[in-house]
Amino acid sequence: MRDVLREEKKFLINQAEALKLRNYLSNTIHTDPHNGTDGYPVRSLYFDSLSNRDFQEKEDGVELRRKLRLRVYSPDAEFALFEMKQKQGPYQRKRSLRLSRMEAQALIEGDYSVLLNSGSEFGQECYSIMEMWAYRPKTVVEYDRFAFIAPENSIRITFDSGIRANEVNFNIFDRNLVLNSVMSPFDVVLEVKYNGFLLSYIKHMLLPVQKSEISVSKYCMARQIGCDYRF
């Protein structure tokens, strides 16, 4: 089980701003080794209660809230990560549990016992939450990510574009999964994650986009139709 606690800033920027920042970062810090030429896809299945508790708490701006998701980086992946993200004031805590493809498929089909049988306290905690609040699969979200990393303060900077989703087919291993765009193709979500404090050159880089800082959730964006959410 992986446990990460860090601060996180999000900005909604356009493609021109993203290109300028990416060019700057390419000459300043390391690119993520998983990037390849054009970045990499991220696909997540989000779970929520029957009453959409997590969605509603995000919409209402509740300070302490959570999201539960199952994540893969390819429909051909042999494993998936079951994750809980918790908002704790200015911090985001993310805990992850690795599941086999078979376990992940069972989870998608509603068999949450794979969490209980994981031998992990975190898995047992998630099982209890999902059973107590009657969590069900709600939406699949996919986007294209290009990432940069710096060892100082565990800085990670990501550019997410082409955000798309569906609320019908929850099989994240489906190669032919039909997804619909939920964000303008001209927009990019910039995320800056770090421990402690941001280094001065990163702060300087962000000055032109400071006014674009937002509290955005890809999960909520994906559910804008089903929950009458407007971004």
Tell me what each language-model feature is.
Residues M1-F231:
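Phosphate-end processing signature that detects enzymes handling 5′-triphosphorylated RNA
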